[in-house]
Regions:
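N-terminal low-complexity, intrinsically disordered segments
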Residues: 1-48
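Short, low-complexity intrinsically disordered segments
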Residues: 31, 51-53, 94
Length: 129
């Protein structure tokens, strides 16, 4: 199961992000911010990294491990010979999706234990932040 949080904001300047080499999905800036916010609540996270569907961080805390992803669809600039960059103005309003996946052992999966739920502490925190 996955929990999704969607929102619209211009708070994150994706023009300062490392362009995702797999496709035109931003997410690095929102995950850097989210990782800093989670650290204030005793969660540890890795630096953001690219995935073919966007960006992700690994998060540990409250006795559990999670993969937290983020993405906002943007376009690349179409300039032959130029470096890969997003074709948006700084601080443009974008639709964001954050997804939370909870890591479970094979035994937990077989026994139906430790499932991700809406009331999971990390899900509640991500929605509150």
């Amino acid at each position: 199961m996955v929990q999704l949080v969607s929102f619209k904001t211009s708070r994150f300047d994706v023009t300062q992000e490392t362009p995702n080499e797999s496709n035109a999905y931003a997410g690095e800036s929102v995950l850097r911010w989210l990782g800093d916010e989670l650290a204030k609540h005793r969660y540890e996270s890795t630096p953001p990294d690219m995935e073919d569907w966007g960006w992700y961080i690994d998060v540990k805390g409250a006795g559990n491990s999670y993969l937290v992803g983020a993405s906002a669809g943007v376009e690349y600039k179409d300039e032959p010979g130029s470096a890969l960059s997003y074709d948006v103005t700084p601080n443009v309003m974008l639709d964001w999706t954050i997804q939370v996946h909870k890591s479970r052992t094979v035994m937990q999966k077989l026994l139906g234990k430790n499932k991700l739920a809406v009331e999971d502490p990390l899900c509640v925190l991500v929605e509150r932040i």
